[in-house]
């Protein structure tokens, strides 16, 4: 079987969401991030916490194959205990849009206090990087992301691909699946 990776932003400019799925015979489709808004590929891959939460909130992950990085389901009580005793500004706490918490959740995040240190370390290691671009990308998704989940969702945790971009993770997963 062949695979097609539908990338992000400009890298998906070639993609026409009007193409009917039936026309892609023997082709497995892997979409990145927000492509779910305009199409329904066989699989969606997301590495960023905010995008994962958006996909989950849309209901897409309840009916479609999704692959999310750092996706570890824990009892919901863990979320409450995680927030106890910390003075975390509200702008750094991101809950998904569920009216009522479920019995399980996923807790992810980036500590804004250690972020500057990580940026400086990365710049030392890779001095030729565009510092402005690096900072913009690393500051993305700062805070705690708490997503209450359903037991019947279609999310598969991405394992062993820390540091991959979404497109690279999608290609790796497609190869691993044998397509």
What are the language-model segments listed below?
Residues 1-29:
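N-terminal glycine-/serine-/threonine-rich phosphate-binding loop
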Residues 19-178:
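Acidic/Gly/His-enriched mid-domain segments of enzyme catalytic cores or analogous surface patches
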């Amino acid at each position: 079987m062949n695979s097609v990776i539908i990338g992000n932003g400009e890298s998906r400019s070639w993609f026409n969401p009007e193409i009917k799925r039936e026309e892609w015979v023997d082709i497995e489709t892997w979409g990145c991030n927000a492509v779910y808004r305009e199409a329904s590929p066989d699989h969606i891959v997301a590495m960023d916490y905010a995008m994962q939460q958006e996909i989950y909130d849309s209901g897409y992950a309840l009916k479609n194959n999704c692959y999310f990085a750092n996706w570890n389901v824990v009892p919901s009580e863990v979320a409450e205990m995680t927030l106890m005793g910390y003075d975390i500004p509200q702008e750094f706490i991101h809950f998904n849009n569920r009216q009522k918490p479920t019995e399980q959740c996923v807790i992810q995040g980036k500590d804004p206090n250690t972020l500057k240190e990580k940026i400086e370390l990365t710049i030392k290691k890779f001095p030729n990087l565009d510092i402005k671009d690096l900072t913009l990308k690393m500051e993305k998704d700062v805070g705690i992301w708490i997503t209450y989940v359903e037991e019947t969702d279609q999310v598969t945790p991405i394992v062993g691909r820390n540091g991959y971009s979404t497109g690279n993770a999608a290609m790796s997963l497609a190869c691993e699946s044998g397509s």
